Amino acid sequence: MKAKGYIGLITKGTPARGLAGATLGFFIGFAAVSLFGPTAKSLRGILGLSPLEVGLLVAAPSLSGSLLRIPFSAWVDTTGGRKPFLVLLFLSIAGMAGLFLTLHFYYPERMPRSFFPLILFLGVLCGCGIATFSVGISQVAYWYPKARHGTALGTYAGIGNLAPGIFTLLLPFALVSMGLAGSYLAWLAFLIAGTGLYAVVGRNAWYFQMVAQGVPVEEAKPASAARGQEIFPAGNLIESLLLSARIWKTWALVAVYFTTFGGFIALTAWLPVYWISFYAVTPVVAGTLAGAYSILTSLVRVGGGYLSDRLGGELTGILALCFMLVGALMMTLSGNFRLSVVAGIFLAIGMGVTNAAVFKLVAQEVPEAVGGAAGWVGGLGAFGGFAIPPILGTIVEIRGAGGYASGFVVFVGLAAISLLLVGVLRQKRARVFAAI
């Protein structure tokens, strides 16, 4: 499409194509959440890892995946999402290539314990793809009018969040048929093909395309607005981050999202270890159970958004966190396989619905700095995916095999604290309405 007044200026893409590209890129990158969970048993035996080190192993991808969210989201405001997406995916490819080559040439006979730091580093590199979440959120938001953000962003997050569950389901089968190195080679091929496809399909919104071709900002905005683009870079992300950081409600929501979304990432990585080590199931069964948890959590997030619109974010969050608390208590006290499966369902429902409720609350509780608050919540909240698994591993080290169950007391505590915080938010809001 040619822009008026600029000979040779061509803009490409549509909102639907922008959504498809961003969703594809996020799906490809976010799968790294499940990088080591299904394979931890094999690596633990070869490297001689303690439970704490297993926790660090499965959490490694989430370190970069959470900490890179804020800076790469800010980068979108200057260049559009395409370049940040490709950089993160190429870093993930580099990590996966290194992991495959290490396993291909050294696993299992020539892979002593001294390889553990290298494996962790490669896991952190692979996890860069997890940070594509914030990039895609911004890229999709620029393509769509505000009235369609709910549907567009819900589609983006819902489909992309399915990736870890699907890979957790598939990886154990790949291990049986292709071995450890072969499984990661297949994943590497998927990453390369998917990144290439994103490079073809992914498009920045019209405004960024025009600016990149030399159109002045003051002319690119009205030209893009004429085609339906409503959102433009405000240029005040730093100010928004600083302002939202001074509002206590921002940190309350960070804590809740740390519990539910960070907890979701942590459990997607940890549950295969839990099922194999505590109930002695096969890797295929463990992968199926962990994958089902991850997929269910992602799917109910969509319904959680609907409930939040109908019941309000606070009430939805309180009800969902009660589900999570019950599930965590059941996991902590249960030594029964079937009861633990039911508990996992409670956890999935509670976490998934609360994840949706939190972002309903961001705009409601911090209206003066929504962008900054969303950055803190999304970035630091996801850090739970890195912080929680080592804590679970430490509890196993201290308590032995029984620690796999009693470690869920961490989620009991987090759910209780989050319930208290959402309750305070609800009470404060009720007082405001009463004073009007």
Language model features with spans:
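Juxtamembrane intracellular "pre-TM" segments in multi-pass secondary transporters
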Residues: 1-13, 209-252
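C-terminal ends and interior cores of transmembrane alpha-helices
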Residues: 90-111, 322-335
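Cytoplasmic helix-loop-helix junction between adjacent transmembrane helices
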Residues: 122-159
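Helix-loop-helix hairpin linking two adjacent transmembrane segments in secondary transporters
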Residues: 156-207
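A membrane-interface helix-boundary motif in multi-pass transporters
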Residues: 176-189, 394-414
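C-terminal membrane-cytosol helix-exit motif in multi-pass small-molecule transporters
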Residues: 189-223, 419-426
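C-terminal transmembrane helical hairpin of 12-TM major facilitator-type secondary transporters
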Residues: 308-358
